[in-house]
C-alpha cells in the first residue's frame, strides 16, 4: 500500500515526520499527535488547559480539512492530558471546537 504524507499549511513543519498520512486508494487518514502549538511551533495557552485544548482541536481541524474531511469524518480521537485529575475535566470541555 502506498502512503501520501502531507504537512498542511497552518501546522508546524517537523523535520522528522509529517502531520498527515493518507493510505492511497482508501479513505484512511492518520493525523500525528496535535498539541497546543501554532504554525510556527510556538506554544499556545501557557498553563491554560482550555486554551491548549482549543489550539490542539484547531490543529486537528486544519489537518483533517487538508484532505477534504471534517470532524464528522473522525472515527476515533484520543486525548492525553499531563498530570490528569478529575478536576481538569471542566477545563478540558471548555476548549471550543473550531469550525470554518
What residues fall within each predicted segment?
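Short, polar/acidic, helix-capping and beta-turn segments at strand->helix junctions
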Residues: 1-100
